[in-house]
């Protein structure tokens, strides 16, 4: 009997170092060759990812086994799977959504499909995802959703006792880096919401699926390996994660819970405690300067979430937006020098000098400044002075 057709969609951005291994693991699946296709959606990579794919897989691209979408703008995670629908084969039954830094075991697709085919209600199916660098340790198998305060509690995170996850089970959410999605979802509740751009797009779609009385299944027989070496060892040191996950959690609440209910109160209480704890962990394991920078991205994500800002946001915006935390005459001279530098070099400069910030603690003005300005600490001030206004940001 002919197997259901699976479209395997890989969202790609600056992963030249591993994208070939990821694609090769797809092409090597123990699944009928005429029953799956590969769609790679590249989000305007600048590290040569697209050129590498074209060089290594030119034959597969020519014969349409691989469809390569070379986007000129970054559409984000959610946007990648929306773009894929424009070129997907008409008879697809399942989409395997996967990150570009995931490598599949040879039986992964077959095992995911086997579990999905057991019931029409099995709209999401995931498997065991291990770390690529440490194949004895689980990355995660999924999560329990806590929708009223926008938190997903991971299951199997960093677990080495695999026997606990040797049986198939029903979960709220599956590991989003490798999950099979039934076409029934698109017809029944719609697709990914591009408003999120990064993070919470999976949670949103799975939550809507649960509300539609569908079932999400984990099968231990489907195995993948996630390369996380480009990520921070501490996610609270990742400004992109801090901004988009904070903003996404608020967008999730505003979208799925229309009134300002108990859910919002629980979110403000529990979620902020979680982020505050993480940021202070960074403070004690990093330095004061980095702590302030990352705190800024958390507050900006929080503010933009409340404001309802959606889609892509350039967290490295053009122009020089500076807060100088310092005191005394030296900081005043430095600010004057920076203003002169901006005029000579035709640079848009937004400058705030907060006097005595390090002596008196962070003022209300300093906290407000996190929303709109980059930060220079004492070490950076010295660098600027030593290089005669070469700017670090």
Predicted regions and their residues:
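A short, conserved alpha-helix in the catalytic core of glycosyltransferases
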Residues: 172-181, 185-191, 195-223
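Short, acidic, metal-binding catalytic loop of nucleotide-sugar glycosyltransferases
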Residues: 25-35
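Conserved donor NDP-sugar-binding/catalytic core segment of glycosyltransferases
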Residues: 107-140, 144-147
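A conserved acidic beta->alpha catalytic loop
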Residues: 25, 42-51, 73
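Short beta-strand-to-loop acidic/aromatic patch adjacent to the donor-nucleotide binding site
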Residues: 92-103
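Glycine-rich nucleotide/cofactor/substrate-binding loop typically near the N-terminus or early
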Residues: 351-393
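Non-catalytic, C-terminal membrane-associated alpha-helical segments of glycosyltransferases
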Residues: 240-244, 259-317
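Glycine-rich, basic loop-to-helix element that forms the pyrophosphate-binding segment
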Residues: 70-88
């Amino acid at each position: 009997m002919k197997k259901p057709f699976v479209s395997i969609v890989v969202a790609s951005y600056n992963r030249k170092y591993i994208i070939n291994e990821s694609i090769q693991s797809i092409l090597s699946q123990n699944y009928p060759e005429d029953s799956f296709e590969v769609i790679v959606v590249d989000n305007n990579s600048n590290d040569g990812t697209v050129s590498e794919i074209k060089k290594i897989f030119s034959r597969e691209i020519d014969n349409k086994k691989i469809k390569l979408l070379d986007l000129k703008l970054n559409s984000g995670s959610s946007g990648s799977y929306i773009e894929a629908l424009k070129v997907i084969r008409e008879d697809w039954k399942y989409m395997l959504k996967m990150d570009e830094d995931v490598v599949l075991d040879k039986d992964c697709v077959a095992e995911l499909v086997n579990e999905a085919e057991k019931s029409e209600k099995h709209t999401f199916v995931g498997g065991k995802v291990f770390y690529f660098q440490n194949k004895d340790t689980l990355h995660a198998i999924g999560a329990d959703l806590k929708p009223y305060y926008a938190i997903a509690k991971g299951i199997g995170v960093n677990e080495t006792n695999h026997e606990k996850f040797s049986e198939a089970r029903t979960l709220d959410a599956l590991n989003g880096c490798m999950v099979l999605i039934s076409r029934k979802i698109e017809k029944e509740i719609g697709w990914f919401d591009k408003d999120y751009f990064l993070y919470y797009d999976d949670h949103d779609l799975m939550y809507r699926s649960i509300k539609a009385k569908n079932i999400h299944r984990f099968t231990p027989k489907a195995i993948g390996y996630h390369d996380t070496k480009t990520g921070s060892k501490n996610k609270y040191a990742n400004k992109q994660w801090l901004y988009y996950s904070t903003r996404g959690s608020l967008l999730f609440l505003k979208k799925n819970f229309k009134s300002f209910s108990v859910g919002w109160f629980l979110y403000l209480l529990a979620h902020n405690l979680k982020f505050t704890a993480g940021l202070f962990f960074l403070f004690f394991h990093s330095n004061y300067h980095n702590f302030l920078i990352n705190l800024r991205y958390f507050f900006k994500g929080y503010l933009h979430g409340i404001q309802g800002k959606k889609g892509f946001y350039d967290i490295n915006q053009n122009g020089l937006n500076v807060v100088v935390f310092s005191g005394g005459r030296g900081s005043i001279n430095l600010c004057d020098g920076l203003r002169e530098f901006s005029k000579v070099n035709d640079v848009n400069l937004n400058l705030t000098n907060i006097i005595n910030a390090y002596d008196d603690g962070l003022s209300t003005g300093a906290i407000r400044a996190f929303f709109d300005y980059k930060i220079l600490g004492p070490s950076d001030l010295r660098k600027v002075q030593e290089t005669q206004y070469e700017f670090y940001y």
